[in-house]
Curated annotation (Swiss-Prot):
The lineage of its organism: Bacteria, Bacillati, Bacillota, Bacilli, Bacillales. Gene3D superfamilies: GHMP Kinase, N-terminal domain, K Homology domain, type 1, Nucleic acid-binding proteins. The gene is pnp. It catalyses: RNA(n+1) + phosphate = RNA(n) + a ribonucleoside 5'-diphosphate. Keywords: Cytoplasm, Magnesium, Metal-binding, Nucleotidyltransferase, RNA-binding, Transferase. Residues 693-723 have a biased composition (Basic and acidic residues). Its cofactor is Mg(2+). This is Polyribonucleotide nucleotidyltransferase. GO terms for cellular component: cytosol. One of its GO terms (molecular function) is magnesium ion binding.
Length: 723
């Protein structure tokens, strides 16, 4: 049995311990991370033999357990089901800095699983899982060029903070996750409140200093318990075959890559590949399938090398653009007549149609995960159908990529969404990618800005996004603006930056090399700003301000404030009162605990009617006020008059007229309208009314006057007698 070993350090003011040797001993490597009261187990397993195919089969799983926060899962089965969006995004977050650190040609399957056992809300389980993934790999026998680490960075009043608490995060204007090795940054994910490029770069470099310390900490663990790395057979092409294929195809491939239009370029490249493959099929080789697979791989590498050489040496891109040139832009709003807002954004051969839907606040999304229960009134969803790239295949539920791109767009736009008080609506954006040749996630951000302006959402400022690329050969590097699909596929970086004219609102960086220096990051951010401002200028030329009026098909929401103690009156016993209002008017009603009432309907007349009913219900009678109401009930001692919805008062028989009244029915009948004056509201809230107080008193002869006894119209409640 392996002996448990514990390694500890301090991390953002909390104790961080890494335990190895006790749990998950059959995995290639495993580590239990304790960070504050957060506990995460990460296990890594690598297959002994390579898998067929021309890609690296790495799988990262992040499993949230509801028991970690003392909750029982909902639903009929009462057990964890499909991963939440947050779990999916965390798995992507861990995958991205780890993947570049496996050798090229590595084909053995690697699976990393992080299981959340306990959650301290101020100690991020995501960052613990990222650290655990690195530790599990570096102490295993799986060849991995780590360690890596990741940290969260915030900025409060100009001061940068590592792993901010929930309270600190609410005050922060930057929400950044950065990961990398001791030497360089290789993954960034950020949201921000329109911060400058300089502030974002400083936040990244501030985080890298803490990453260095965590990498040094892991080196101590490796020295104590690290296993010797196993020998792995890397996929390497046969040198003679490679030279042969290169000689036959290089010139033709170079010419094909320079074809500017995407579909024509793809066809030209495919023609070159088919010609070479057919020539090998004609040889009728004994191991034909294996040779053809290797030739196909060599041809793809030639395509990659030629594109990179063209950009790096000639500074020419496959479509003929300069390195900082943006593709042609076009946009349109109001395409769809019955939706609340729509925007079509096209950049080259990438096109996104975004649709904005407005709904009452009650239709917000409830997120019941490992954190506190959250209510989300702004959502952005991204769909990527296969026809957008001219392919066929089954249409499945949104995958990791679609969830990730939707979340990136949401993060980019959320800082310009008006507050609930300014605009009391739930806002859902859906971006449909209709055509894609790179940067579709950023096109969805631009389309969503157009859709919200078209819908009349008073956003603080328009937001645009741009994807930057990089080709690095040795010390020479070229930064590309507005990358297309081929440049993304064969390039070294996908660096997405979104923001307003005043600053960055979202940033995401993935790279395929070991890491990036501060200089490259700085230049990429500066070049991205130029591109973003160019795109924003185009967007505002299409629509510069939110529409003054909402769509005729959007719900109109009116806000009313009532006293919190009156909420029960509006709702009524068992919801009877509020349901009656909804049935009568067809509106939707939401009531907050502070007494804010939201009334929503496409019909403004019905909104006003519902408001009038509620105002009547919560209206308070005042002594001395005069009302006209209807007689709702008659008793021997008087008539009950409805002053307004939900409020009745009693006109005692003696208050009907100055003269003596024998029967109530002699003066009033059921359903009669009568004007009365409030003469008393007793300690139980009962209202006493008078009709005669509004009538002229007839003079009586002195002899006819009789002293009148004082009358109490509602019987007083007696206190129980003490025995």
């Amino acid at each position: 049995m392996s002996e448990k070993q514990v390694f500890s350090t301090e991390w953002a003011g909390k104790t961080l311990s890494v335990e190895v040797g006790q749990l998950a001993k059959q995995a290639s490597g495993a580590a239990l991370i304790r960070y504050g009261d957060t506990v995460v187990l990460t296990a890594a397993v690598g297959s002994k033999k390579p898998r067929p195919g021309d890609f690296f089969p790495l799988t990262v799983n992040y499993e949230e357990k509801m028991y970690s926060v003392g909750k029982v899962p909902g639903g009929f089965l009462k057990r964890e089901g499909r991963p939440s969006d947050r779990a999916t995004l965390t798995a992507r977050l861990i995958d991205r800095p780890i993947r570049p650190l496996f050798a090229e040609g590595f084909r053995n399957e690697v699976q990393i699983t992080s299981t959340v056992f306990s959650v301290d809300q101020d100690c991020s389980p995501e960052m613990a899982a990222m650290l655990g993934s690195s530790v599990a790999l570096v102490i295993s026998d799986i060849p991995f060029e780590g360690p890596i680490a990741g940290v969260d960075v915030g900025r409060i009043d100009g001061k940068y903070v590592i792993n901010p608490t929930i309270e600190q995060a609410e005050k922060s204007d930057i929400s950044l996750t950065v990961a990398g090795t001791y030497d360089a940054i290789n993954m960034v994910e950020a949201g921000a409140k329109e911060v400058s490029e300089e502030a974002m770069l400083e936040a990244i470099m501030f985080g890298h200093e803490e990453i260095k310390r965590l990498c040094e900490f892991q080196q101590q663990i490796i020295a104590a318990v690290g296993k010797e790395k196993r020998e792995i057979e890397l996929f390497v092409s046969d040198p003679e075959l490679e030279a042969e294929v290169k000689a036959a195809s290089e010139g033709k491939m170079k010419a094909a890559i320079k074809t500017e239009e995407k579909k024509a370029r793809e066809a030209a490249i495919e023609e070159v590949k088919e010609e070479i493959l057919e020539s090998y099929k004609a040889k009728e080789l004994e191991n034909e399938a294996e040779i053809l697979g290797e030739v196909a791989h060599i041809l793809e590498m030639i395509e990659k090398d030629e594109m990179r050489r063209l950009i790096s040496q000639d500074k020419i891109r496959p479509d003929g653009r300069k390195v900082n040139e943006i593709r042609p832009l076009s946009s349109e709003v109001g395409m769809l007549p019955r939706v609340h807002g729509s925007g079509l954004f096209t950049r080259g051969q990438t096109q996104a149609l975004s649709v904005c839907t407005l709904a009452p606040l009650r239709e917000h999304q409830i997120i019941d995960g490992l954190g506190t229960e959250e209510y989300k009134r702004f959502m952005h969803h991204y769909n990527f159908p296969q026809f957008s790239v001219g392919e066929t295949g089954p249409r499945r539920a949104p995958g990791r990529r679609e969830i990730g791109h939707g979340a990136l767009g949401e993060r980019a736009l959320q800082y310009v969404i008006p507050s609930e008080e300014e605009f009391p609506y739930t806002i859902r954006l859906v971006s449909e990618v209709l055509e894609s040749n790179g940067s579709s996630s950023q096109a969805s951000i631009c389309g969503s800005t157009l859709a919200m302006l078209d819908a009349g959402v008073p956003i603080k400022a328009p937001v645009a996004g741009i994807a930057m690329g990089l080709v690095k050969l040795g010390d020479d590097y070229t930064i590309l603006s507005d990358i297309q699909g081929m440049e993304d596929h064969f390039g070294d970086m996908d660096f997405k930056v979104a923001g307003t004219k005043d600053g960055i609102t979202a940033l995401q960086m993935d790279i395929k090399i070991d890491g990036l220096s501060r200089q490259i990051l700085d230049e990429a951010l500066t070049q991205a700003k130029e591109g973003r401002l160019h795109i924003l200028e185009h967007l505002t030329s299409t629509i510069s301000e939110p529409r003054e009026e909402l769509s005729a098909y959007a719900p109109k929401i009116i806000t009313l404030n009532i006293k919190p103690e009156k909420i029960k009156d509006v709702i009524g016993p068992g919801g009877k009162q509020i349901n009656a209002i909804i049935e009568e008017t067809g509106v939707k009603i939401d009531i907050e605990q502070d007494g804010t009432v939201y009334i929503a309907s496409q019909d403004q007349a019905m909104n006003r009617k519902a408001i009038a009913i509620i105002e009547d219900i919560v209206r308070e009678v005042e002594v001395g006020e005069v009302y006209t109401g209807k007689v709702r009930r008659i008793e021997k001692f008087g008539a009950f008059v409805e002053l307004f919805k939900g409020t009745d008062g009693l006109v005692h028989i003696s208050e009907l007229a100055h003269e003596r009244v024998g029967k109530v029915e002699d003066i009033l009948k059921l359903g009669d309208e009568v004007t009365v004056k409030v003469i008393e509201v007793d300690h139980q809230g009962r209202v006493n009314l008078s009709r005669k107080a509004l009538l002229e008193k007839k003079e009586q002869p002195e002899g006819d006057k009789k002293p009148q006894a004082e009358k109490k119209f509602y019987p007083k409640t007696k206190k129980p007698e003490s025995k």
